[in-house]
Curated annotation (Swiss-Prot):
Species: Bartonella quintana (strain Toulouse)
Cofactor: record remark: Binds 1 Mg(2+) ion per subunit.
GO molecular function: magnesium ion binding; phosphoglucosamine mutase activity; phosphomannomutase activity
Recorded GO CC terms: cytosol
Reaction catalysed by this enzyme: alpha-D-glucosamine 1-phosphate = D-glucosamine 6-phosphate
Protein name: Phosphoglucosamine mutase
UniProt-listed GO biological process terms: carbohydrate metabolic process; peptidoglycan biosynthetic process; UDP-N-acetylglucosamine biosynthetic process
Xref: Pfam families: PGM_PMM_I (PF02878), PGM_PMM_II (PF02879), PGM_PMM_III (PF02880), PGM_PMM_IV (PF00408)
Modified residues annotated as Phosphoserine in this record: S102
């Protein structure tokens, strides 16, 4: 059953529009605070945010809710999402909160929740929180003497920087490397350039001047144009693109060519397999990862396990299988030797370590496999249940049969936007084009019929 407020990556929406309003955020703080206060000991919550203007509003609202429930709030300020997960553990907090909409534009925002172990909360706990949100909590709040307090914590970003630096093998330095890092005007604008510089690299930071509205604006992992231009301009060895909250990374090689998350996973998995660091003889990715990655890993005798989209599902599968590498083509890369969630900076450091240890260029290192042709289309919809219609289901089944066993068709509703994502993948491009175009028309047609039906019912 779909959850009421939580999507694939927490609660998300447009700032000052439900559910990203201050009154609702305060209710979330109350509900989460009441639940965790009753189960835990420290009653401590750490709260981080990215650089969106609305972060201030939501931070204050959440603090009001948490303190009303008797929780002590430690405010980290702008930090990457993985820093919240890491500091949640090191500060012995019961809960971690990240205020961010990740790679989305500045006008969106969201609330991500982490448990005391640094892992994102389970669906079961999120459902309990939703039930509490819809409950009158006035009798469950703290007494006057037990109201919590809020404290702004200074300097913890440097704890995260040191943590990230320690993930690099001791005998590896970045001396003489020219690195461009695109901070997306986001949460990693301090941490990423500083860590790379302290490790010896010559660093060129771009999009590192957030103003509240320029996060992810023609920059970062969703728009590599400015990074490619800078890599070419300064003749860099590598370009690193992070997203707004620092949990994704894409790479641009010295030829200004894009390296996506699938290729990065292949590089790390192959290197760790050779050096005996790969656990469980496999890797976890999502249904959106390229078939070429699966074929590459299979040739190495490694298994590829696919999950639904969302790094939380990747992490769940990694824990179940005992694997220490997982990720998504979009650049979420989870390395459980180091952390509990996607970490763009740490993943980039592991790629740089592979590059230094192999003494090869980034373009050579990151060409591990030839991607299978893949087409991705988004259909904006009004009816989120359009995929449940029998006619649509039948059309999807027929299209899947038409593609055959050596190709894939993945159609899913986005967990963060009102769109249906259609991905076709296979060796025969013409067939793919036809099938994907057909499915775009089918879904758009039946969504339009839903709108007509709804208007007739309301007339």
């Amino acid at each position: 059953m779909a959850q009421k407020y939580f999507g694939t990556d927490g609660i998300r929406g447009k700032a000052n529009v439900f559910p990203m309003t201050p009154d609702f955020a305060m209710k979330v703080g109350m509900a989460v605070g009441v639940l965790f206060r009753s189960q835990r000991q420290s009653r401590r919550v750490v709260i981080g945010k990215d650089t969106r203007l609305s972060g201030y509003m939501l931070e204050n609202a959440l603090v009001s809710g948490f303190t009303a429930a008797g929780m002590e709030a430690f405010l980290l300020g702008p930090v990457p999402t993985p820093a919240v997960a890491m500091l949640c553990r090191s500060l012995r907090a019961d809960l971690g909160v990240m205020i961010s909409a990740s790679h989305n534009p500045f006008y969106d925002n969201g609330i991500k929740l982490f448990g005391p172990d640094g892992f994102k909360l389970s669906d079961e706990i999120e459902k309990k929180i939703e039930q509490l949100i819809d409950t009158d909590l006035s009798k469950s709040l703290a007494s006057c003497a037990e109201i919590g307090y809020a404290k702004r914590v200074e300097g913890d970003i440097y704890r995260y920087i040191e943590y990230a630096k320690r993930t690099l093998p001791r005998d590896v330095r970045l001396d003489a490397l020219r690195i461009v890092v695109d901070c997306a005007n986001g949460a990693a604008y301090k941490a990423a350039p500083r860590a790379l510089w302290e490790l010896g690299a010559e660093v060129f930071a771009i999009n590192d001047a957030p103003n509240g509205t320029n996060i992810n604006q023609k920059c970062g992992s969703t728009d590599l144009a400015s990074l490619k231009q800078k890599v070419h301009e300064v003749r860099a060895d590598v370009g690193i693109a992070l997203d707004g909250d620092g949990d994704r990374v894409l790479i641009v090689d010295e030829k200004a060519q894009t390296v996506d998350g699938d290729q990065l996973i292949a590089v790390i998995a192959e290197h760790w397999h050779k050096t005996g660091r790969l656990q469980g003889n496999g890797v976890v990715t999502t249904i959106m990862s390229n078939l070429g990655l699966e074929r590459f890993l299979n040739r190495k005798g490694l298994e590829l396990v696919r999950t639904n989209v969302g790094d939380r599902y990747v992490v769940d599968a990694m824990r179940q299988k005992g694997y220490n590498i997982g990720g998504e083509a979009s650049g979420h890369i989870v390395l459980s030797d180091f952390g509990t969630t996607g970490d763009g900076l740490v993943a980039a450091l592991q790629i740089l370590a592979c590059m230094q240890e192999s003494q090869s260029s980034m373009s050579h290192l990151c060409k591990r496999f030839e991607p299978v042709p893949q087409i991705l289309k988004n259909v904006t919809i009004k009816n989120k249940n359009v995929l449940k219609k029998n006619q649509v289901k039948t059309a999807i089944d027929q299209a899947t049969q038409r593609l055959g066993n050596e190709a894939r068709l993945v159609i899913r509703a986005s967990g963060t936007e009102p769109v249906i994502r259609i991905m076709g993948e296979g060796d025969e491009r013409e067939v793919l084009d036809a099938v994907v175009a057909e499915m775009v028309d089918v879904i758009a047609h039946h969504d339009a019929l839903s709108k007509v039906g709804a208007s007739l019912e309301g007339s």
